[in-house]
Design a protein with these regions (language model features):
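Helix-terminus/linker motif at the lipid-water interface of multi-pass membrane proteins
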Residues: 26-62, 80, 115-125
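Short alpha-helical transmembrane segments in multi-pass integral membrane proteins
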Residues: 1, 14, 57, 98-111, ...
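Transmembrane helix-bundle signature of multi-pass secondary active exporters and lipid flippases
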Residues: 40, 53-72, 102-106, 136-143
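Short runs within selected transmembrane alpha-helices of multi-pass transporters and secretion channels
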Residues: 1, 24, 28, 32, ...
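Membrane-embedded alpha-helical segments of multi-pass transporters/permeases
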Residues: 1, 37, 66-69, 107-112, ...
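Helix-loop junctions and terminal segments of transmembrane helices
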Residues: 60-96, 103, 150-155
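Interhelical loop/hinge segments that connect adjacent transmembrane helices in multipass membrane
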Residues: 1-32, 42, 73, 77-87
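Interfacial segments at transmembrane-helix termini and the short loops linking adjacent helices
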Residues: 47, 93, 110-143
Length: 173
């Protein structure tokens, strides 16, 4: 016989501790994903423009996983170093440099071959969709670099600061 009891105080504590992380996830998802909806609503031929944007964004999203994975490897290292009061500067510099090299090489390469990439992947891929992809790849470099600092702030327990940054990003968007 298995018995299951729920203590309201425990549920309240879990919610209170996890709420900032849930809010951060929501805000980051909202500002990262809402562009397609805004394009569709704001432009005269919004459905077409949102489709072109979505086709280019899929590639950005897939490539951004690499930055996310590197940041995911760094976060526990940052957390351990912060807990042990060790300097995070060397790890931060190495992580930033590695991410900068990877993101600039991938980003610049994708910008240079933007039209060919879009034509190869999509039947409707043309110079216009290539230009959209090119601009998104500029943001790829920035997105990749922010993963490093985001993982450092998360490891340091600075979720409130990340929520403020995400809220400002969402408001600007």
């Amino acid at each position: 016989h298995i018995s299951f009891t729920v203590k309201p105080s425990l549920i309240k504590d879990i919610f209170r501790q996890s709420y900032p992380y849930a809010l951060l996830g929501f805000l980051m998802t909202a500002y990262y994903r809402i562009d397609g909806v805004l394009l569709e609503r704001m432009l005269e031929n919004g459905a077409y423009e949102a489709g072109v944007y979505a086709s280019a964004f899929r590639l950005l999203d897939a490539l951004a996983i690499a930055g996310f994975l590197i940041a995911g490897v760094l976060m526990p290292m940052f957390a351990r170093m912060l807990e042990e009061n060790k300097s995070i500067q060397p790890l931060l510099e190495i992580g930033f440099k590695v991410m900068l090299i990877i993101s600039v090489c991938v980003g610049v390469g994708a910008i240079f071959y933007r039209n060919e990439i879009m034509a190869l992947l999509y039947l409707s891929g043309d110079a216009y969709s290539g230009s959209i992809f090119g601009w998104l790849m500029v943001s790829f470099i920035c997105i990749s670099l922010t993963y490093i600092y985001g993982s450092l702030l998360t490891a340091g327990g600075k979720i409130a600061l990340l929520n403020i940054i995400s809220l400002v990003g969402f408001a600007i968007n």
